[in-house]
Structures are given as structure tokens and as C-alpha cells.
Amino acid sequence: MSSSSSITTTLPLCTNKSLSSSFTTTNSSLLSKPSQLFLHGRRNQSFKVSCNANNVDKNPDAVDRRNVLLGLGGLYGAANLAPLATAAPIPPPDLKSCGTAHVKEGVDVIYSCCPPVPDDIDSVPYYKFPSMTKLRIRPPAHAADEEYVAKYQLATSRMRELDKDPFDPLGFKQQANIHCAYCNGAYKVGGKELQVHFSWLFFPFHRWYLYFYERILGSLINDPTFALPYWNWDHPKGMRIPPMFDREGSSLYDEKRNQNHRNGTIIDLGHFGKEVDTPQLQIMTNNLTLMYRQMVTNAPCPSQFFGAAYPLGSEPSPGQGTIENIPHTPVHIWTGDKPRQKNGEDMGNFYSAGLDPIFYCHHANVDRMWNEWKLIGGKRRDLTDKDWLNSEFFFYDENRNPYRVKVRDCLDSKKMGFDYAPMPTPWRNFKPIRKSSSGKVNTASIAPVSKVFPLAKLDRAISFSITRPASSRTTQEKNEQEEILTFNKISYDDRNYVRFDVFLNVDKTVNADELDKAEFAGSYTSLPHVHGSNTNHVTSLTFKLAITELLEDIGLEDEDTIAVTLVPKAGGEEVSIESVEIKLEDC
């Protein structure tokens, strides 16, 4: 039996607990919410922090004046107040009001995903990086030697042993619960649910998450140089579950994985929950094509790579970036045990994903893509919006000390003390050049976009023609503005897997299983998740595809009107789209 199989019976049905260095439970008292039990404890250790802004951050931009207005200098009390009229960065969540996480409508996570609450919650300091003598180098998982594997297994075993005290913030389940709390409706900020996916928070949140997880593992084996491995799924040699995670009885093994995808099965980076009989070579080819599209074609600018802006007061899940969309989500779906688990546990659902050790290996490679993307050049650089830079999260470090962290402090992995062992990136040179058709599709024979949208359901392949805002643009114009194919108000049931593919200059007879064609523009995917305040579970967001390079490759730069085809792969009968347009956006 796997270690994750007993989760529902070993974790207590409570909301949160004060942190004690001895982890001793004392008397209980009720929270303001009658249905929630709050267990108090006393810490023998303490920390001191000045709330003076000069001691918070030496960076002049670190203390945003709007944060002061929100009372964030005194920390969490203002997190649940109604939002101000102007935007502001997302504050750390209010741990004292952490509530029930949800699997889906009417189904709550049966254990608390909330972390223990420190006694000095209103004085939690900002994290400062400790001094270091050498970088921690994260290796590709498939190439790890047995000495490394043994060390990683030992560290994970010791982390699992800490689950004997379910309130130990360093325990494996408490670490997994971080993802559950931030992603399944347990937290609210500004009166709205906090969600760290489907927006520009995706990359920085997960980078900080792995940073502390990695340091905890290292501390448990007394090795400050220990580094997490990365699942090198963007290289053909790494396109399978790394062997170290596929050993039954190991602390790195999880029973709740798709058993059809073990023993060296090639991963499909575009997986959408259904098994497709595709030759291995074609899967690998599709994978490299997807990587090129997501890292190069569709992400020439920061906004496309990181995702939509998500300031305080805005609705959660405004729109995901290219890598979060694919391959991040399909890897979750492919690994999770959808055939045997109702909700695709473990990797196939946000609330349970952290219960599989491979989650952290997967996200290490996702994080590596952040570094690789900036190396491609052009305008691929970090965002500069202060609402992004000053957004904050809450974590415990390896010494069980609580800290606040800012996005601005995680932009350079080397400054954080880690880097990635280099591996070839063959996808960089994998631009699809082979065309499905020899000429231009007759757009006059295809219904115009105004006759197709709004679309009630994407239950079959559809084609439409659409007019571009400008044609025959100069190189300078292309450098200044990216041409964006924009799908407005895509709505669907967020409890289901969703994917559809987008093609240009082909009709609905296109072979959508072969993605290594110049006309393939990109895909939209979604992992099941829940908005706690959204009782009808309908997600509505915008999906954007950068198409400037694509139009050049297909030879459509001078065309005023182009053909677009959408091919549903999963959940299309639940997908509606209000409108589609092409816009020019500053890069």
C-alpha cells in the first residue's frame, strides 16, 4: 500500500493550529466560524521583528504605499477586506481565516489543508537569503546516479516520518497541503478567493514553494547542497517517468498514478485525459513541436509567458501563460490516476498533486523553463509591474520559522542559491516547417467569425474566417507589437479536463493528431480545479495566441483575412466562446 493511501484517515478534521516547537496540543477553543475547530499551542521558540518599513526591505520599491493603506505592515488582518478602487499587489493569505478546500461542487477535501498558525502572526518577517558557499545544482532526474537517488529517498522518508505530528509544517503532508490551500479555495484575499494558477502568480509561487521544500529535504539529511531533480520532459531522453519515481516501496513512489504510463511509457505533453493510439516517434515529435510553440512562437513577450495580470481585487484565474497551459497541465493529467481515481488523484487534481513526490520534480522543470525562456532572447524578460513584483506568499523555512516572501526576490535562481545542470534543448530548433496544405485556404468559402460566435459549445471541429487589424507589417512594427489571436470569455465547467487545438490556414478536416505542421498555432488546456465562491463552477477567461511568427512561416503576412480552425480534444461539449478577435499588443 502506498503512503498516500491512508491520507483520509490520518489527518485530523480541523482547520488550523498554532505552531509549537514541541508540537503539543493543549485546550481547544472555537473560531469565529462555529463549524471550525481551532487548536491552540504555545511555541517555546520565538522571533523578533521590527515592523518599521526600513527593516522590511532595503529596496525602495519593496514597501508599496498601497500595502500600507491595506494594513499589510501589520500583516494579515487586511487580507479579507473589500478591495480598494485602485489595484494593488496580492498580499500573503490570512492564515487565521483559512477555510475548507474543495475538490468539486458539494465535495470538500475531508482534511484541513491549512498550515499551523504562528503565535506572532502579525509580525511575520520577510525572508532573507542565508549566506552560501556554492550553488545547489538541480540534476536531470533520468540521469541521476544511485548515490543521489539514495540520498533523495532518505530525505523524503524522513519528511514522511514527520507526519507523525500532523501539525509539523515540515511534514510531507503539510508540505503537500500548501498546494491544496493556495489552489482549492481555502484562502481569500481582498474578499475573493486566492488562486495561484491561471495568472502571473504561477511561476513565482511555485519557485518559492520548491525553494523551501528543497531546503527542508536538505536539512533532514544534513546536506545544505542537496538539490531537487528536474523531470526533463522537454528532451527525448527524459520523456518518461524517471526511474527513481517508479520503484514500488520507495518513498518516491505513489500508488495513485496512471498504471498505463509506467515502465518507460513515452509521455504525451499534450495529453488530455484520453488514450490515443499514436506512434512513439510521433508523440516525441509532437512534444518537441509543442515545446517550440510554447517557448518561442507563442511567448515572444512577458505577458504571454507569465499569464494575465492578477492584482488585488480582481477575479481569480484571469488567464494562464504558455508553459502553465502546456506542458504543465498535460503532465499533471498524464501522471494522475484518472482510470482508477474519481478526481484524477494524485497529480491530476490541484488539491492532491503535492502528495506525489514527482510533483516537485515536474515543477522543477517547469521552473527551469523560466530560466530557459529568458535565455532565448528578444523581449523575453521578467515582468516589471509593481503589482507583480510586490505580491507576497507565506512559507515556513527548514527551521520551522514562518516568513513572508515577495515575487521580486525570486527572479534570479542563482541569487536564491540554485541553478540547473545543463541539458540540450532540441525544441529550440524544432520549428515546424512542413505544411498541411500547399496554398491558401479560400476564406470566402468559410463562415466569417461574426456568424460563428458566440459559440454555445465546441462539440465538434469548426472553421471560420477572421480579418486582421493590419497586414504586410514592417519588421519594426512587428518588433513593437505582437499580433494576438484572442479568444474572449472561454467558459466551461472547471471540474473537468478541457483541451482544444488551434490551426491556421486549414479547414476542419485537418489531422489534429499530427502537431508538427506549420499551421498548428497552439492549444488550450485546463486541469480540474474549484473556485470556492463559484457555486456553478463555470470558469470564464481569455486565451491568447501570439501568431506573428506563425503567419510568416505559413506565408500569410500579406493577407487581410485568414482561416482559423478549432479542434476539441476533451470537454468540448462544455466549452463556450463568446468572441474571437485579432489584436495588436505592445510587447
Curated annotation (Swiss-Prot):
Would you tell me the Gene Ontology cellular component terms? chloroplast thylakoid lumen
Q: Which GO terms describe its molecular function?
A: catechol oxidase activity; metal ion binding
Q: Where does Cu cation A bind?
A: H179, H197, H206
Cysteine disulfide links: C98-C114, C113-C180
Q: Which UniProt keywords apply?
A: Chloroplast, Copper, Disulfide bond, Metal-binding, Oxidoreductase, Plastid, Thioether bond, Thylakoid, Transit peptide
Q: Which residues bind Cu cation B?
A: H328, H332, H363
Q: Name the family the entry cites.
A: Belongs to the tyrosinase family.
What is this protein called in UniProt? Polyphenol oxidase E, chloroplastic
Q: Which organism is it from?
A: Solanum lycopersicum (Tomato)
